[in-house]
C-alpha cells in the first residue's frame, strides 16, 4: 500500500508498442483517460483495459509524486501477461 503521508499522487502509466502496425499508445497525465490514485482513492483498484490485438502485451509502470518536493519517482516497468499485474519491488518506493 502507498504511504500517503509521503506521496501526493501516484499515476499508473500504461503503454504498448506495435512497430509492425506503427501503433504507439500511451496513458499519461494529460490524457482524459488518465489513471490516478490519491489518498482519497482505495489502494486496491481494478483497472479495466481493452486491447484490440491480444498479441501486443502492454507495459505498466507507476509514477509517484512526492508531497513536499513534488519530485517524481518512477518504478520499474513490467509487461502485462495476465489479469493480475505484480508491480516491481521498487513500487511503492520507501
Where are each of the predicted segments found?
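Intrinsic disorder/low-complexity signal
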Residues: 12, 17, 28, 52, ...
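A compositionally biased, intrinsically disordered/low-complexity signal enriched
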Residues: 7, 14-16, 35-37, 45-47, ...
Amino acid at each position: 500500500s502507498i504511504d500517503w503521508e509521503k506521496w501526493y499522487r501516484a499515476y499508473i502509466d500504461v503503454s504498448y508498442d506495435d512497430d509492425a502496425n506503427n501503433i504507439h499508445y500511451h496513458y499519461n497525465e494529460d490524457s482524459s483517460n488518465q489513471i490516478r490514485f490519491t489518498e482519497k482513492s482505495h489502494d486496491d483498484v481494478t483497472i479495466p483495459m481493452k486491447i484490440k490485438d491480444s498479441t501486443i502485451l502492454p507495459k505498466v509502470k507507476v509514477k509517484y509524486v512526492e508531497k513536499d518536493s513534488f519530485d517524481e519517482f518512477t518504478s520499474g516497468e513490467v509487461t502485462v501477461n495476465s489479469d493480475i499485474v505484480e508491480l516491481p519491488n521498487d513500487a511503492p518506493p520507501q
